[in-house]
């Protein structure tokens, strides 16, 4: 096997726009700044926007003229 062919795997700091900071390991040689993390993403926080199915149907009917 060849030696010294794998990239260095180092600890980096990841900073989210919400202020959450955590450490992880990566081959990236610099710290990361991200927009969303598990602390602020709607899927993980449970603050998802519920889409009204009735509103979507009315929008479809208005756009394509289908009405009953």
UniProtKB/Swiss-Prot annotation:
Name of the molecule in the record: Large ribosomal subunit protein bL31
Function of the protein: Binds the 23S rRNA.
Subunit and interaction comment: Part of the 50S ribosomal subunit.
Pfam families noted in UniProt: Ribosomal_L31
GO terms under biological process: translation
Coiled coil segments of this chain: none
Listed GO MF terms: metal ion binding; rRNA binding; structural constituent of ribosome
UniProt-listed InterPro entries: Ribosomal_bL28/bL31-like_sf, Ribosomal_bL31, Ribosomal_bL31_A, Ribosomal_bL31_sf
Cellular component GO terms held in the UniProt record: ribonucleoprotein complex; ribosome
Alphabetical UniProt keywords: Metal-binding, Ribonucleoprotein, Ribosomal protein, RNA-binding, rRNA-binding, Zinc
Organism: Acidithiobacillus ferrooxidans (strain ATCC 23270 / DSM 14882 / CIP 104768 / NCIMB 8455) (Ferrobacillus ferrooxidans (strain ATCC 23270))
Gene: rpmE
Family label: Belongs to the bacterial ribosomal protein bL31 family. Type A subfamily.
CC cofactor: Zn(2+)
Residues involved in Zn(2+) binding: 16, 18, 37, 40
Cofactor binding, note field: Binds 1 zinc ion per subunit.
């Amino acid at each position: 096997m060849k030696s010294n062919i794998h990239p260095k795997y180092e600890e980096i700091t990841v900073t989210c726009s919400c202020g959450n900071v955590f450490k992880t390991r990566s081959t990236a040689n610099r710290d990361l700044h991200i927009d969303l993390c598990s602390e602020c993403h709607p899927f993980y926080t449970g603050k998802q926007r519920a889409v009204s199915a009735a509103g979507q149907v009315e929008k479809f009917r208005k756009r394509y003229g289908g009405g009953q």
